[in-house]
Amino acid sequence: MIVRSIWKGAISFGLVHIPIKLFAATEEKDVRFHLLHKECHNPIQYQKRCPYCDREVTPEEIVKGFEYDKGRYVIITQEELEGLAPEGSRSIDIQSFVALKEIDPIFFVKTYYLSPDQHGQKAYALLRNALRETDRLALARVILRTKEALVALRVYGKGLAMHTMLYPEEIRSMEPLGDLGESIEVSAKEQTMAVQLIESLTEPFDPVKWQSEQRERIRHFINAKVQGQAIVEAPQTPTVGKVIDLMEALKASIQQVKTQQKKEAAPKKERRRKTS
């Protein structure tokens, strides 16, 4: 599969200039449905209409406007927006370096891969190796599609990844949520049991293990319908009742985990006997 870059520019690192290309690191895998007319099954079309002129408008007739008062707009052109972009807008300007643990994941939005061009490989390797050695990530600013973005550069695999980030004012406060259990007293025994349950479920992260079960069910369902097969409904998940005794629930959960781990370990022991 041909991978195409979505942006070309450079990383500015002190007096070092690193020409790079930007590539999307993620892609959506959701099952997409088309909206069809129920009677004839043809796709629904959406038209851009002006309610005042009562007619459809073309893309050339559409402009951007900011509503500064109810029903009142100031028109902003694309040229004006581009004129507001700072000089060096094709540059990822590194401002500082921080430890990854200092940034909460809530700040990260989207991930991209950074690839050096032929003349920037040595400088790229230098930055990557320095970030790896210091266990740091770089905070930078860049203009993407006329919009200034706060980004973080870090080592990922053999290269560098760039995460777009939210600004602090874009993250909502938790204060309006009220009391989040801070006034509730938890006994030392309950705390110990909860920690024990967490420890028993702790394991190395294996990304392959985490697949979208719902997406697979939808795909199987669609394939069955396309092939004219009988549709089998999924069994209903038992409704979980209200937990009355927290300690009993924790004990039962720990026992359930132990039982499951024994079942998973049994086939491995059986295989060892056969190979010995």
From Swiss-Prot:
Keywords: DNA damage, DNA recombination, DNA repair, DNA-binding. Residues 256-276 are annotated as: Disordered. Residues 11-177 form the Ku domain. InterPro entries: Ku70/Ku80_beta-barrel_dom (IPR006164), Prok_Ku (IPR009187), SPOC-like_C_dom_sf (IPR016194). Signal peptide: none annotated. Pfam families: Ku. GO terms for biological process: DNA recombination; double-strand break repair via nonhomologous end joining. Disulfide bonds: none annotated. One of its GO terms (molecular function) is double-stranded DNA binding. Gene3D superfamilies: 2.40.290.10. With LigD forms a non-homologous end joining (NHEJ) DNA repair enzyme, which repairs dsDNA breaks with reduced fidelity. Binds linear dsDNA with 5'- and 3'- overhangs but not closed circular dsDNA nor ssDNA. Recruits and stimulates the ligase activity of LigD. Belongs to the prokaryotic Ku family. PANTHER family: NON-HOMOLOGOUS END JOINING PROTEIN KU. This is Non-homologous end joining protein Ku.
